[in-house]
C-alpha cells in the first residue's frame, strides 16, 4: 500500500476509495431499479394483451347474442303478422289460418300496392281482392299514418297528416300508390 506524504494526499486517497464504493453502490442500485422497471413493463404489457383478448371474446359473445335477439325479434314480428286462430263452436272445432303480407293493425291487414294507379283503378283492384281503400279517420291518429301518408283514401283524396282546403286532387288524372285494407277473421 502506498503511504501518503502529506495529509492532503492521505485524505484524497482515502476519499477516492470511499467515493469508488459509493459509485459501485449507485450503479448496482441503478441496475436493480432498471431491471425492476423492465420487469414491470413486461408484466403490464402482458396484462394489457390478456385484457384485450378477454374483451374481444366478450364483445364477440355480446354481438352474437345481439344478432340472436334481432333474429328472434324478426321471427316474432313475422309470427305476429301471421295470425293463427282457433274458432270453436258447439259442435265442431275449426283451425283457421290467415296471413297478412302487409301491416297488421286491430284486425285489419293493410297491403301496399306500390304501382301508381288512378283512384278508380285502385278502388277496383281493392274491390277485386275483397278489400277496401283505407279510411283517413281510421289511420290518422295511429302509427299507420307514417306508412299510408300520400296514398289513396276511401274518399278519393290522398291521405295526409294535415288537412287544408287546397288539397283537392283531380282523381281522373292523378296517380298514387295505395293500400288495400282487408278485415282478418
Swiss-Prot record:
Protein localization: Virion membrane; Host membrane
GO cellular-component term (any): membrane
Intravirion side: 1-33
The keyword Glycoprotein belongs to this UniProt entry's keyword annotation: yes
Taxonomy, superkingdom: Viruses
Membrane topology according to the record: Single-pass type II membrane protein
Transmembrane region(s): 34-56
Function noted in UniProt: Forms a complex with OPG162 and OPG190 to coordinate the incorporation of OPG164 into wrapped enveloped virion (EV) membranes and, subsequently, the production of actin tails. Therefore plays an essential role in efficient cell-to-cell spread of viral particles.
Designated name of the protein: Protein OPG161
Keywords in alphabetical order: Disulfide bond, Glycoprotein, Host membrane, Membrane, Signal-anchor, Transmembrane, Transmembrane helix, Viral envelope protein, Virion
InterPro entries: C-type_lectin-like/link_sf (IPR016186), Chordopox_A33R (IPR009238)
Subunit structure: Homodimer, disulfide-linked. Interacts with protein OPG190. Interacts (via C-terminus) with protein OPG164. Interacts with OPG162.
Record topology, Virion surface segments: 57-185
Glycosites: 125, 135
Similarity comment: Belongs to the orthopoxvirus OPG161 family.
Region (C-type lectin-like domain): 98-185
Amino acid at each position: 500500500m502506498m503511504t501518503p506524504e502529506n495529509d492532503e494526499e492521505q485524505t484524497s486517497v482515502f476519499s477516492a476509495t470511499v467515493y469508488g464504493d459509493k459509485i459501485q453502490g449507485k450503479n448496482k442500485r441503478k441496475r436493480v431499479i432498471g431491471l425492476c422497471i423492465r420487469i414491470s413493463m413486461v408484466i403490464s404489457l402482458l396484462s394489457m394483451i390478456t385484457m384485450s383478448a378477454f374483451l374481444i371474446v366478450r364483445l364477440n359473445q355480446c354481438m352474437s347474442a345481439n344478432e340472436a335477439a334481432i333474429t328472434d325479434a324478426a321471427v316474432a314480428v313475422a309470427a305476429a303478422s301471421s295470425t293463427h286462430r282457433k274458432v270453436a263452436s258447439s259442435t265442431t272445432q275449426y283451425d283457421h289460418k290467415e296471413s297478412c303480407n302487409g301491416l297488421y293493425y286491430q284486425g285489419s291487414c293493410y297491403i301496399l300496392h306500390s304501382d301508381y294507379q288512378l283512384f278508380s283503378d285502385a278502388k277496383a283492384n281493392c274491390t277485386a281482392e275483397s278489400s277496401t281503400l283505407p279510411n283517413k279517420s281510421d289511420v290518422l291518429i295511429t302509427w299507420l299514418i307514417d306508412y299510408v301518408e300520400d296514398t289513396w283514401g276511401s274518399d278519393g283524396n290522398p291521405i295526409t297528416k294535415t288537412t287544408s282546403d287546397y288539397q283537392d286532387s283531380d282523381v281522373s288524372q292523378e296517380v298514387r300508390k295505395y293500400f288495400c285494407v282487408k278485415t282478418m277473421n
